[in-house]
């Protein structure tokens, strides 16, 4: 427990307390749990009792397929090695040539994934383009309880589920392309999906854009270095 005292005239007290409470409520590591007021010699003294809670924060990166999320997340994890823990998602999607089990994803078949859903093994899961994606509860909740900041790269449905479950711990960040034409170009450049799949991804992107208002930060990935620097600034501001 920590106690903070503010002693001021009535006129200044309201503004002081308002600013302090706003600052406290913006940081999950500090929770206002009680207060009392003492009136003495025409001054008002307010004593705030604060409980320190060292839970980690959950940084959720999402955005349409092909926007560059994975490359940005890897760069952020490399830069913030001591401050971020990456939670590896599970998926039923087919493994790409460049991907490795247990590093990029935990690859599951449909029956295995659905059994994990029945066991309540995920903090979030969603079906995206006919494939399941989910974040395993075991590693995620252990990191949060230990005070470790968690980085998730997940689909927008999952992002909203995490926000609903951990409203005071979550920072939602949406990565968007500069244009649909550029997104199409990037999807084709990957050269690992047919035209039908690419078309579905573009349609899905339009649906995702409708959810942007649910995200605290929206970052346009036009130039990688500029986007990365913007994300670094966002994370640094949230760490403080």
From Swiss-Prot:
Q: Name one Pfam family in it.
A: Guanylate_kin
Per UniProt, the enzyme's principal EC class comes to transferase
Q: Does the keyword Nucleus apply?
A: no
The catalytic activity, as recorded, is:
GMP + ATP = GDP + ADP
Q: Where in the cell is it found?
A: Cytoplasm
Q: Name one GO molecular function term.
A: guanylate kinase activity
Q: Provide the leader sequence positions.
A: none
Primary residence: cytoplasm
- PANTHER family xref list: GUANYLATE KINASE (PTHR23117:SF13), GUANYLATE KINASE-RELATED (PTHR23117)
What is the recorded function of this protein according to its Swiss-Prot or TrEMBL entry?
A: Essential for recycling GMP and indirectly, cGMP.
Q: What is this protein called?
A: Guanylate kinase
Name its species.
Answer: Mycoplasma genitalium (strain ATCC 33530 / DSM 19775 / NCTC 10195 / G37)
| Taxonomic path | Bacteria, Bacillati, Mycoplasmatota, Mycoplasmoidales, Mycoplasmoidaceae
